[in-house]
Amino acid sequence: MNPQKGVNPTQNPPFRQVLIDESTQATEPECLIPLVMGCKQLVLVGDHCQLGPVIMCKKAAKAGLAQSLFERLVLVGVKPIRLQVQYRMHPCLSEFPSSAFYEGTLQNGVTQSERVQAGVDFPWPVPTRPMMFYVQVGGGRG
């Protein structure tokens, strides 16, 4: 938006709707930019129980910059819509966040058996465990 060209972003907003993913990791000023630019609907997606904005300056953090707009809205009583079904993690991995942060209500949208890809013949070390560490020593290209 070049003010020299006579464009007023509040009269002609570049976007009517804006969705900010991981908004709990963004600072308040970052999340306010779309509103200042005139967007009509702002959707904040995130989890205020997870990592917030990373602020390196202690003075700025103490002044409130370490709190996201999402968290501030939750603290003043705006009720967020909670994730109910997750598709990202293996069901065994989702057990911890479900019990620790979601009172055991987080459901899995994909079962363990549905996560197996057809045609992938990687020999998984322990099929009942969703994690492994693979260490490759040498043989890399330099």
Identify the residue ranges that each predicted region occupies.
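Conserved helicase motor core of SF1/SF2 NTP-dependent helicases
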Residues: 1-142
